[in-house]
Amino acid sequence: MTVTPQRRTELLRGVLDLCLLAVVLDEPAYGYEMTRRLRERGLSTVGEGSIYPLLGRLERDGLVATHREASEGGPPRKYYRASPSGRSALAEGVRAWREVRGEVDSVLATIEAGVA
């Protein structure tokens, strides 16, 4: 069975904020650049429209710092970078993700042979 883009989005919903923090951990980026970085790392179905609500929440929660820079031929771009709180949240989130992923893998491994 092929994973549909909709199902992939549902599965990513809980961890996309971690992925966004990861791609702006060391170098700031604006929205389009962030989606490009995510795609380069394998998240091909993530679009700009799906990240902006998350970026707004990350900014409100103090997990990203922002600044604006002029762009060629357009309005200024808003750049995002992980704040110190964002770095801590990312580290904690990665630990939690690995723990949950391990638990889910354990459950699915028990039935994997019978499903394949």
List where the protein language model places each region.
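A cross-family signal for key residues in well-ordered alpha-helices
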Residues: 22, 36, 56, 91, ...
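Amphipathic alpha-helical dimerization/coiled-coil segments
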Residues: 4, 88-116
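Short, Lys/Arg-enriched N-terminal segment that forms or immediately precedes the first helix
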Residues: 1-9
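Beta-hairpin "wing" of winged helix-turn-helix
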Residues: 61-73, 81
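Short, hydrophobic-biased segments on the C-terminal half of alpha helices
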Residues: 52-59
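Accessory beta->alpha helical hairpin/"wing" motif in late/C-terminal subdomains of nucleic-acid enzymes
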Residues: 82-86
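N-terminal helix-turn-helix DNA-binding core of bacterial DNA-binding proteins
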Residues: 8-52
